[in-house]
């Protein structure tokens, strides 16, 4: 009983994930093939890598919607640096530093201006996206053309396995462990929850708000850079639009995973399960021949249903009291 009280939503998500796979398996038996389930994660698991630190950002009461553009910028930067003759062993760490810098720019602007993080990251979304297109043009790859020619050892990396699991999935699992420990087993993680519950109380308690926010947004930038590197390796080319479609699925996964969009609560494990739930939903719909437009609409409907359902769950006692008052009024009338 205590386990269900503590991890009730995560257990619900796990049950829904199993049910989803079984239902799609009735329409297409390939969905029940363990190899298909494992290797199809490479198509969406990079969304999960970004969604994990994004969960911590949202729990802190913030938001970052610029990570898609950060992915594109990091991908193009990796391509340009490689074109310039820099070895991949140096280009990859430099790309991670660019991602961290993008996150620190977000944090710095939020702390310095005091403007809502949504507005700041909306601006940097266009800033980073425009910078990616500019760099793409300077490299000779006009529009959304990619930069190719990467060494085979790099392009094969995201398609290799470790202990029978795809490399991107292994990296995702390591990230889940890392962020779970950071969020639920460290003082920094407790600070994240306290800042999200009340930034004023956190400030009066002398919590390191600036340092914590810088850490969170920098981690989101680093995760975006890691996703960019994996995507470039997976597709074999660096393009400025690689993260363009990540925003909606990532936020859906975070909210579906149990994070309060206003801050103060959230779960890394819940987000990880929600990533798989949303990812397999897209995969399953494609396998049964559902058009992309309908698939996107269903993802949006899922997000709305989750928000409404969580709101009803959190305020069920108020709803119950309201219904009781209505019944009392009808009885007295």
Curated annotation (Swiss-Prot):
GO molecular function annotations of the record: transmembrane transporter activity
Main localization, broad class: membrane
Keywords: Cell inner membrane, Cell membrane, Membrane, Transmembrane, Transmembrane helix, Transport
Record Pfam families: BPD_transp_2
Location(s) in or outside the cell: Cell inner membrane
Transmembrane segments: 7-27, 45-65, 67-87, 90-110, 118-138, 162-182, 212-232, 240-260, 261-281, 288-308
Origin superkingdom: Bacteria
Assembly information from the UniProt record: The complex is composed of two ATP-binding proteins (LsrA), two transmembrane proteins (LsrC and LsrD) and a solute-binding protein (LsrB).
Family affiliation: Belongs to the binding-protein-dependent transport system permease family. AraH/RbsC subfamily.
Protein's UniProt name: Autoinducer 2 import system permease protein LsrD
Source species: Yersinia pestis
């Amino acid at each position: 009983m205590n386990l269900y009280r503590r991890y009730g939503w995560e257990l619900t998500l796990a049950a829904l994930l199993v049910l989803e796979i079984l239902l799609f398996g009735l329409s297409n038996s390939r969905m029940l093939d363990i190899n298909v389930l494992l290797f199809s994660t490479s198509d969406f698991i990079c969304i999960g890598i970004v969604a994990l630190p994004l969960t911590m950002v949202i729990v802190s009461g913030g938001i970052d919607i610029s990570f898609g553009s950060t992915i594109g910028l990091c991908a193009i930067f990796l391509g340009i640096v490689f074109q310039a003759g820099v070895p991949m062993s140096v280009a990859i760490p430099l790309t991670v530093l660019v991602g961290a810098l993008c996150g620190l720019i977000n944090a710095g602007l939020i702390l310095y201006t005091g403007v809502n993080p949504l507005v700041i990251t909306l601006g940097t979304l266009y800033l980073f996206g425009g910078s990616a297109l500019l760099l793409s043009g300077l490299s000779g790859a006009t529009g959304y053309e990619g930069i190719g020619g990467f060494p085979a050892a790099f392009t094969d990396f995201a398609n290799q396995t470790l202990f029978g699991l795809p490399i991107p999935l292994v990296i995702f699992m390591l990230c889940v462990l890392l962020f779970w420990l950071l969020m639920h087993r460290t003082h920094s993680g407790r600070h994240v929850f306290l800042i999200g519950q009340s930034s004023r109380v956190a400030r009066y308690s002398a919590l390191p708000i600036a340092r914590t926010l810088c850490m969170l947004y920098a981690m989101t930038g680093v995760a975006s850079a890691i996703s960019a590197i994996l995507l470039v390796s997976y597709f074999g080319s660096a393009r400025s639009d690689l993260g363009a479609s990540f925003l909606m699925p990532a936020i859906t996964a975070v909210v579906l995973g149990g994070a309060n969009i206003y801050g103060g609560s959230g779960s890394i494990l819940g987000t990880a399960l929600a990533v798989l739930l949303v990812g397999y939903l897209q995969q399953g719909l494609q396998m049964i021949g559902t058009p992309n437009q309908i698939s996107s609409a269903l993802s949006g409907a899922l997000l709305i249903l989750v928000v409404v359902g969580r709101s009803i769950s959190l305020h069920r006692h108020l709803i119950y009291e309201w219904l009781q008052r209505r019944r009392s009024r009808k009885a007295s009338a």
